[in-house]
Amino acid sequence: MFDNLSERLERSFKILKGEGRITEINIAETVKDIRKALLEADVNYKTAKQFTDEVKAKALGQNVMTAVRPGQLMVKITHDELANLMGGEAAEINLKGNPAVILMSGLQGSGKTTFSAKLANYLQTKKNKKVMLVACDVYRPAAIEQLRVLGEQINAKVYTGEGEANPVIKAQKAIQEAKVYGYDVVIVDTAGRLAVDEQMMQEIAAIKQAIDPQETLFVVDAMTGQDAVNTAKEFNDRLDFDGVILTKLDGDARGGAALSIRSVVQKPIKFIGTGEKMDALDVFHPSRMADRILGMGDVVSLVERAQEQYDEEEARRISKRIAKNQFDFNDFLSQLAQIKKMGSMKDLMGMIPGMDKALKGVEVSDDAFKPIEAIISSMTPQERSNPSLLNGSRKNRIAKGSGTSIVEVNRFLKQFEQTSKMMKKMQQMQGLRRR
């Protein structure tokens, strides 16, 4: 999402290249260029001005050490101010309550219903909570059905309250049922509208007053830019919500909403949606997002995702097979599945420092795995277990069966061989370190 902004900021920092120290003159040009970059990214004008004024003041107040070049100092100051702009620290979701009630609000099409299910999945899998979803959009049967289907996917109870046309009463009844059956969290998905209107505001305000939620969250589509900020302000003025959810942050929008919304409404961004899958949800960490904006990657989040998907028993099994030179295509496919569970390739590449720049102009897609999976799937069980069996005629058969070419098959086999050797070497090095 922040690719263009990252490039523009990098250009801004280059203005100070070759400068021995920061002065009023060279900092003025740099700050002006940073402000222009932010405005091009659809950041709110007032926010952009306040941000650059703060950066300028901090930069002029620094005594640059001889070991730190002005350009490096500007990167550090900009990083810290970006993190502050987006809230400084990650904001925890309030789950105190019996049950804890979370009220979802937002416009139609913002991804509110999908995010409600993602949040339920997150609370069930990461926080070990028993969650009930409540379908309070009484105007769109499709929205109720959507939540029901998503609930089935994540194995969460969905309260539909069939026959009840009053969303306030439906929400109240759902919470009563949740108390009876021992649910820890109730997530109330409300009706969206194509635009903010008085009827909508009155209805959701009435629901909030009736159920007194621990959290009222505003869901907004990050792709809508400044409209997202304006809508957030209108909702906050009427609802006084507790936090913001930014959806579709994996899209190609300029990113202005993520940078503006916190300073405009003075409410934290709590979660971000980064894809269609039910686990495509991340707690929002301002400092990590600042890292990504400045092209530094997000190694901490990458490691966290890897740890979440880490299967210790499987890792031991693979390790033993590598040690015995038995690593085969079945094992390779197993490792590929583990990587895919971590998220989209585009998202993962964005977390690796410098990778965005290295892959500039290259379309990173999960489809890259498909030819490999097709090639392995076209092998016989014996071939998967014994790579040395693959002679010319077998390769031709695999190429035809997988819809690929013999060149692609040979390329993959070479990559597989190199991967096997590298894994063997790494294991040997680890063994030497332990001695």
Regions found by a protein language model. Name each.
Residues 161-166, 220-224:
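Conserved helicase motor
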Residues 8-136, 143-164, 171-190:
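Primarily NTPase-proximal linker/entry elements flanking Walker-type ATP/GTP-binding cores
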Residues 127-132, 154-158, 184-186, 211-216, ...:
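Short, surface-exposed connector motifs at secondary-structure boundaries
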Residues 16, 42, 78, 107, ...:
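Residue-level signature of catalytic and energy-coupling elements of molecular machines
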Residues 2-19, 288-435:
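Long amphipathic alpha-helical segments used for membrane anchoring, targeting, substrate engagement
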Residues 39-40, 57-60, 83, 87, ...:
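Generic secondary-structure signature for well-ordered alpha-helical cores
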Residues 171-175, 183, 195, 199-209, ...:
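Conserved phosphate-handling catalytic cores of large alpha/beta enzymes
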